[in-house]
Amino acid sequence: PLYSSAASDVYKRQVLALSIASTEHPLQALAEDYVGRVLTKLDYVGVLAFEFFEVDGGLKANEIAPRVHNSGHWTIEGAECSQFENHLRAVAGLPLGSTAKVGESAMLNFLGSVPDVAKVTAIADCHLHHYGKAFKAGRKVGHATLRCADMASLKARIAEVDALIQG
């Protein structure tokens, strides 16, 4: 199996708001061990997303999603091969692509509405993904992915996008 970098997630009103891909997470190896055992037991093909909570220095599984997952959308621009492409490769029996990170990456969800598109796309290192869904309070209607050369730049870009989201 291949594993993507762990991501640290921030939730607002129980909905994923921000996901930051970690370069080196101290619990990455433990997470890969847990996930690997599940994949082997199920003889699983495709993308399987796990959400863990850090508890007392260990991990507790909260969600297992047998599909591409919102928390992995950062891979679209932030990995050599995105979760979407690797899912298609897996189910088609093709060789999997590298999940290696490209730079420092994050994803911010647009909930209920999409900020001014011109302002979002004017932010350096920012990529807009609009789902074309009807706007509804709390509904995921799009997201921005960020890919930067370093963590300081990433944090600055996150603040810029978040300011647009907050209005």
Residue ranges and their predicted role:
Residues 29-50, 55-56, 65-113:
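Active-site "cap" helix and flanking loop/linker of ATP-utilizing ligase/carboxylase catalytic domains
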Residues 54-58, 148-150:
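Short acidic-glycine loop/turn motifs at beta-strand connectors
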Residues 32, 61, 84, 138-141:
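A general structural signal for well-ordered alpha-helical segments in protein cores
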Residues 1-7, 11:
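Single conserved hydrophobic/aromatic residue that forms the stacking wall/gate
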Residues 89-167:
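Peripheral (often C-terminal) accessory segments that flank ATP-dependent C-N-forming ligase machineries
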Residues 23-27:
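A short, structured beta-strand-centered segment in the mid-to-C-terminal lobe
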Residues 12-22, 63-76:
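Short, flexible active-site loops
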